[in-house]
From Swiss-Prot:
Gene designation: tbx5
Classification via SMART domains: TBOX
Main location class: nucleus
Protein name, per record: T-box transcription factor TBX5
Role according to the record: DNA-binding protein that regulates the transcription of several genes and is involved in heart development and limb pattern formation. May bind to the core DNA motif of promoters.
Keyword Signal among record annotations: no
Oligomer status and interactors: Monomer. Homodimer (via the T-box); binds DNA as homodimer.
Length: 519
């Protein structure tokens, strides 16, 4: 950039080839500036031969004068900030067919450092060393004289920065220093390269565009002027008539002002999966009216209250409800019923995953029968491995898919439709397993104890119990209600006939000596 300035013969750059010409031409330019002080008059600083007829007029000069009277300030940031007012000029006197390059630079206006105190600018010391000058080349360069003269030439994209290591080509300035923008019109020469010393150029300076760079506005009058005239500063303007009118409309009945806390409560309650039951039960008095269910039995809001005990006693009329009988095997996943508001559907249509804490309303005998079957079967599943069952269990025709281990919360209840039913065995005494011939070699050779053998058999029994739980009972499973739950306690290999010697104690077969040796 410094080489470019030397080539153009900038005033602060020593040029040995044409020093006298540059000194003579400013006098003529100063006479032009003194003779014409109208707002539309151009002010030229330096002009070379062949560029005499070019005139430049500052756009929005009145606005620049308003800022200049107060003391123009320009904000500089690390990322770069654009100027306001924008530097726009009108150029005339160019050769229509000749190509020109328009450049702009900002140079120090003096060698002082300033400070703002007592509502005025004053000199506080010597200026810091100036950074190497940077040139802003207009994006349309090079262009013909016709292109430059038919519209305003704007330097709106020029940015000011205080970052001395700026890599984006912004103009680097020091804070609290005074600067003067300059416009350069360079005649593009195809024979000579860009930046040749023989290239003709002219420089134009407008004193009302001088400003002081600052990181924040010091004079409140400058702040007010920029807010009033900058179209991008509408957010900083005060409550004028339009703003007051807009606020009055917002606070009217058409646009009620809702507190943010109320909005947050509504948003959080709508996203909660359990919020609708609580809000509908306690929030409105209209829930005392009865709503008809699918089975024709009415239920009130009192029926929907959760039970007082977390572990109710059997027969469990307030236990979780699983409507497996209403699901079809051919039902597609897209047809599954999802969570719906309570006011839109009846309780029997709700997903049991969310309704598990509520009691079942009084329904027909078919639903009660299925409910009791689920409770009895769960009791048998929970207590089968701890003690022999002493209470009768319903028949196999009542056994449905309502169990804790085989029913997923959102899918149908078909489990192992192609599996064979379990073979039912009569009751046998517990000691019969230790006298059978199939178990004698294992007990004598490996020295396994009775608890371990019984534990393995109970595991085998639990697997068969899971297989037999199907959603729709097979015809081959129809039996009388006299079938006891103890028939499921033993595997297939146990003989069905009971001989009298099987009721004797274990030591009569000769197993005690083997245990003593291995122990």
């Amino acid at each position: 950039m410094a080489d470019t300035e030397e080539a153009y013969g900038m005033p602060d750059t020593p040029v040995e080839a044409e020093p006298k010409e540059l000194q003579c031409e400013p006098k003529q330019d100063n006479q032009m500036g003194a003779s014409s002080k109208t707002p539309t008059s151009p002010q030229a600083a330096f002009t070379q031969q062949g560029m005499e007829g070019i005139k430049v007029f500052l756009h929005e000069r009145e606005l620049w004068l308003k800022f200049h009277e107060v003391g123009t300030e320009m904000i500089i940031t690390k990322a770069g900030r654009r100027m306001f007012p924008s530097y726009k000029v009108k150029v005339t006197g160019l050769n229509p067919k000749t190509k020109y390059i328009l450049l702009m630079d900002i140079v120090p206006a003096d060698d002082h450092r300033y400070k703002f105190a007592d509502n005025k600018w004053s000199v506080t010391g010597k200026a810091e060393p100036a950074m190497p000058g940077r040139l802003y080349v207009h994006p349309d360069s090079p262009a013909t004289g016709t292109h430059w003269m038919r519209q305003l030439v704007s330097s709106q994209k020029l940015k000011l920065t205080n970052n001395h290591l700026d890599p984006f080509g912004h103009i680097i300035l020091n804070s609290m220093h005074k600067y003067q923008p300059r416009l350069h019109i360079v005649k593009a020469d195809e024979n000579n390269g860009f930046g040749s010393k023989n290239t003709a150029f002219c420089t134009h300076v407008f004193s009302e565009t001088a400003f002081i760079a600052a990181t924040s506005y010091q004079n409140h009058k400058i702040t007010q002027l920029k807010i009033e005239n900058n179209p991008f500063a509408k957010g900083f303007r005060g409550s004028d008539d339009m703003e007051l009118h807009r606020m009055s409309r917002m606070q009217s009945k058409e646009y009620p002002v809702v507190p943010r806390s109320t909005v947050r409560q509504k948003v959080s309650s709508n996203h909660s999966p359990f919020s609708q039951e609580t809000r509908n039960i306690t929030g409105s008095s209209t829930l005392n009216s009865q709503y008809q269910c699918e089975n024709g039995v009415s239920s009130t809001s009192q029926d929907l209250l959760p039970p007082s005990s977390a572990y109710p006693s059997l027969p469990h009329e307030s236990a979780p409800i699983y409507h497996c009988t209403k699901r079809k095997v051919s039902e597609e996943p897209a047809e599954l019923s999802y969570k719906k508001p309570y006011m839109d559907t009846s309780p029997s249509e709700e997903d049991p995953y969310y309704r598990s804490g509520y009691p079942q309303p009084s329904s027909s005998s078919s639903s009660n029968n299925s409910f009791r079957t689920e409770s009895a079967q769960r009791q048998a599943c929970m207590y089968a491995s701890s003690a022999p069952a002493t209470e009768p269990v319903p028949s196999l025709e009542d056994i449905s898919c309502n169990s804790w281990s085989s029913v997923p919360p959102y899918s149908s209840c078909t489990v192992g439709g192609g599996m064979q039913p379990m073979e039912r065995l009569p009751y046998q005494h517990f000691s019969a397993h230790f006298t059978s011939s199939s178990l004698m070699p294992r007990l004598s050779n490996h020295g396994s104890t009775q608890p371990s053998d019984s534990h393995s058999m109970f595991q085998h029994q639990s697997t068969h119990q899971t297989i037999v739980r199907q959603c729709n009972p097979q015809p081959g499973l129809q039996q009388s209600s006299a079938l006891q739950s103890t028939e499921f306690l033993y595997p297939h290999s146990v003989p069905r006939t009971i001989s009298p010697h099987q009721y004797h104690s274990v030591h009569g077969v000769g197993m005690a000596p083997d245990w003593n040796e291995n122990s």
